[in-house]
Amino acid sequence: MMKWKRIVSAAVCVCMAGMLITGCGSKSDSSSKKRIIRVALSQSEEHPEYKGMETFKKYVEEKLGDKYEVQLYPNELLGGQTKAIELTQTGAIDFTIAGTPNLEIFADVYEVFSMPYLFTSEDAYFAAMNDTDYMNKIYASTEDTGLQVVTWYNVGTRNFYAKKAINTPDDLKGLKMRVQQSPASIKMCNAFGAAASPMAFGEVYTAIQQGVIDGAE
């Protein structure tokens, strides 16, 4: 198992940038005798996240195709990120890629990643995230819950998009803003004077079009 986990981590780090979560594993396909590796994603087939996992799939099946088959489920086909993490816990799927805010309900140490203005520079950010000893302690926080974080990726600068320009926190006052389903993100948004509206990524654009929310993080 540890050898397999090392293979997965190396492959994903080369192919993409991602907070990859693995669980207890699922069953083999008895008819083919192959081990089915199921991966849930929230992004579409055109997103770099999916493209990275396609490369991972190709790599695994080229090297170990007689033993493993990788099945990808994009577009939240199996549910939002929190649901996908729960499926990973139970072994219904093997991996998912999720934002750190979605891990807060499984280990509150992940709230640190939702804090605004935490780092003074991009260099400080990468220095912290590339500190293996520190990150391994973070990853270990979910071991007793049936899942293990394997690696991370950088999704860029946090930002808000809305029906009007957001230049300072004051511009958020009175707006209904979508945030991830994260206690820390909800507190942050409300502290800025907005009304936090937690929802899954797949619901965001429809909610904006229908006027349910004014914008999103």
Residue ranges and their predicted role:
Residues 1-36, 62:
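Short, low-complexity disordered leader/linker segments with a strong preference
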Residues 31-34, 52-53, 79-87, 93-97:
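Conserved N-terminal glycine/acidic-rich loop preference
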Residues 57-61, 89, 99-195:
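Contiguous mixed-secondary-structure segments that line small-molecule binding/active-site clefts
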Residues 66-68, 84-98, 193-196, 210-217:
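Alpha-to-beta junction loops
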Residues 25-41, 54, 61-69, 143, ...:
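Immediate post-signal peptide segment of exported/extracytoplasmic ligand-binding proteins
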Residues 73-86, 180-184, 197-210:
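Short helix-initiation/N-cap motifs at beta->coil->alpha
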Residues 38-55, 74-80:
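Extracytoplasmic "Venus flytrap"
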Residues 46-71, 187-189:
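Short, polar/charged alpha-helical segment
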